[in-house]
Amino acid sequence: MCSSPSAPTAEPDVEMDVHTVSSENLPWLCIVWDDPVNLMSYVTYVFQTVLGYSRKRANELMMQVHTEGKAVVSSGEKDKVEGDVKKLHVAGLWATMQQAG
């Protein structure tokens, strides 16, 4: 008995996206909102001392809060951003967090 060569099998043309984005792996954002209480110089100072920004970057973020009403001042893992929000609250700033996306 003679065996015939097996026929080639076709591979399905499937592309797998290895960079699938789900809500679980999106970063969290710390947002500082404009308020009528804190002076611009104080907000700049808090961004420098609490978040470690340079004077120039802290001033840019403060101006964004002042002119646009809010600014994203940090991002990352949920626990880290929660910590940043708490520190900003202790300093008297209005800060919230939300997941990117």
Swiss-Prot record:
Q: Which SUPFAM superfamilies match?
A: ClpS-like (SSF54736)
One GO biological-process annotation of the entry reads: proteolysis
One of its Pfam families is ClpS
Q: Which Gene3D superfamilies match?
A: 3.30.1390.10
What is stated as this protein's family in its record? Belongs to the ClpS family.
Check the record and name the NCBIfam families matching this protein: PRK00033.1-1
According to its UniProt entry, the function of this protein is described as:
Involved in the modulation of the specificity of the ClpAP-mediated ATP-dependent protein degradation.
Describe, as the record does, how this protein assembles with itself and its partners. Answer: Binds to the N-terminal domain of the chaperone ClpA.
What name does the UniProt record give this protein?
ATP-dependent Clp protease adapter protein ClpS
